[in-house]
Amino acid sequence: MERREGGRDNSSCSNVNQLFGVKDSESLLYDDVFIVRDRNGDSYFAYWDIEKNTFLSEPFYSYRSRNSSYLPKIKAFMSEDRSQIHEVKNGFRSEDHSKINKINGVENLFHNYNMNVLTDDYNFKMGMNGFHRPQSKIHINRFIDSYLQSQICIATTPGSGSDNDSYIHGSRVYGESESYTRSEGRSSSIRTRTKGVELTLRERPGILDRTKKYMYLWLQCDNCYGLNYKKVLKSKMTICEQCGYHLQMSSSDRIELLIDPGTWDPMDEDMVSRDPIKFDSGGGEAYKDRLYFYQRKTGLTEAVQTGIGQLNGIPVAIGVMDFKFMGGSMGSVVGEKITRLIEHATNKFLPLIIVSASGGARMQEGSLSLMQMAKISSALYDYQSNKRLVYVSILTSPTAGGVTASFGMLGDIIIVEPRAYVAFAGKRVIEQTLNQTIPNDSQEAEFLFHKGLFDLIIPRHLLKSVISELFTLHDLFPLNQNSNQYSQYRALLNPIF
């Protein structure tokens, strides 16, 4: 591992093959087009044709008849005083020269490359003859590797100040790219750096498209599009290291976050749906097959986990929905499990927590799924109004549809995570129904909080302690395992499990 001056570790930039898992880095640029100018001022289009396995070029002026509408855009960002190369969004192939768009904010992208070297030393040919392997393979690889190395860095959050190893190691930083510190425990992101201008993968969607096979190592943030290393993301409570956005958590991770270790007792684990209305998928995947797919994918039997546990020593009944199981949709099994949980909490006088993450009622079960809204609400009425017990509703992103319209908004205390999406219908549906435009943030937690829909916006790392304090205010205290009260509590659970 190299060090730079000042004792800071350099970031990983040069080992392109290690990052992308390819032997020939030109395969990454099969759809990129470059505008090249030589010493004589002549301009060319250059691109890699993956089908012909060759690096092709075509004179700039040959595009006038076919792409005259795009020439002003191209000329506008070509430098007049020096040799420059610029990346053009929406790449070409030899059979497809339909569109050229300028990438925002990448003027002088290759400030430290002089294309005289490419045109003179590499025998850059005009027409459609281009470079051919194997004679030019070394030159092409060298050029493309330099391009990638100057633009792609594996970097941690700026200012981490730690000297620990990163998870992907590199060797050096090229040109004027700035070095970043590296630290274990801080997830990595792909950044680009040019003369102090920082570009994220939001501006480089092609890189993500070409590396999907390696995304099992990374989780992309829905807000900033930064990449988070999955091995450390769980220890960070699935919060984006780049922008602090609260990413989706699995139900198992949420139970681990809220419930004390060794106190979790699940309920109704073996309850599964049997396709009650024989849903017609219209030639698509059958409902039973979809259920089986998500059961294998998530390890769950349904879109909710319910059970009994302790939160900082306080016994609670808790249900946690999982959006990764068919979008957390509420069918007859989900409704039945939540109803049974509420009834058990009513009988045992336990505080109730339900964590919502759902797109709404499950269409494959028709009116049976809609009926769950009334069934759960009825059980909650007995729990809250007749027994006077405490129900805390926690809304996470996304919570929508029938869940929002029923138990999601019926809590005695409603807590929402920062920037969570909470809605009944989607923005597009509302605009088409009302025939008017609504603000983009009108369904975010902060906007709705100021309208009075929620009681608290609590970040994930404070959630457990805040709920514990709320229960204490309602005269619910931790159990002493040596007390008679704890023995009575365990005796109540034994007949159930």
Swiss-Prot record:
GO cellular component terms listed in the entry, alphabetical order: acetyl-CoA carboxylase complex; plastid
GO biological process annotation, one example: malonyl-CoA biosynthetic process
Chain ranges of the CoA carboxyltransferase N-terminal domain: 217-489
Manner of cofactor binding, per the entry note: Binds 1 zinc ion per subunit.
Protein family membership: Belongs to the AccD/PCCB family.
Subunit architecture: Acetyl-CoA carboxylase is a heterohexamer composed of biotin carboxyl carrier protein, biotin carboxylase and 2 subunits each of ACCase subunit alpha and ACCase plastid-coded subunit beta (accD).
Name under which the protein is recorded: Acetyl-coenzyme A carboxylase carboxyl transferase subunit beta
Organism: Cuscuta reflexa
Gene, per the UniProt record: accD
